Amino acid sequence: MAQEVRLRLSSTDHYKLEEVCERIKKVVEETGAQMSGPIPLPTKRLLVPTRKSPDGEGKATWDKWEMRIHKRLIDIKGDERTIRRLMRIHIPEEVHVEIIMK
């Protein structure tokens, strides 16, 4: 019996995110399941402006720090064996995975 699984991956490091997507793609191809994706979702940009001067006096100069959160969406239609193999994939700490069973 085929199950539908939606994986939502997010990370600040897009290289590691693509690495995990390739591992997932390889497992799905080996088991013969159907896969759609990875679909790139919009990148979220977090900006934090901070004053350079610690005492608040002097010229108002600012540092702007930015963090980007990259996201991918993968839909998989496969059997229980495929899902078990997906659970055993090594995923780095920087990559967050959300699994939704349909």
From Swiss-Prot:
Listed Gene3D superfamilies: Ribosomal protein S10 domain
UniProt keyword annotations, A-Z: Ribonucleoprotein, Ribosomal protein
Keyword flag rRNA-binding: no
Pfam families, sorted: Ribosomal_S10
GO BP term (any one): translation
GO molecular function, one term: tRNA binding
Top-level lineage group: Archaea
HAMAP family (alphabetical): Ribosomal_uS10 (MF_00508)
Name of the protein in question: Small ribosomal subunit protein uS10
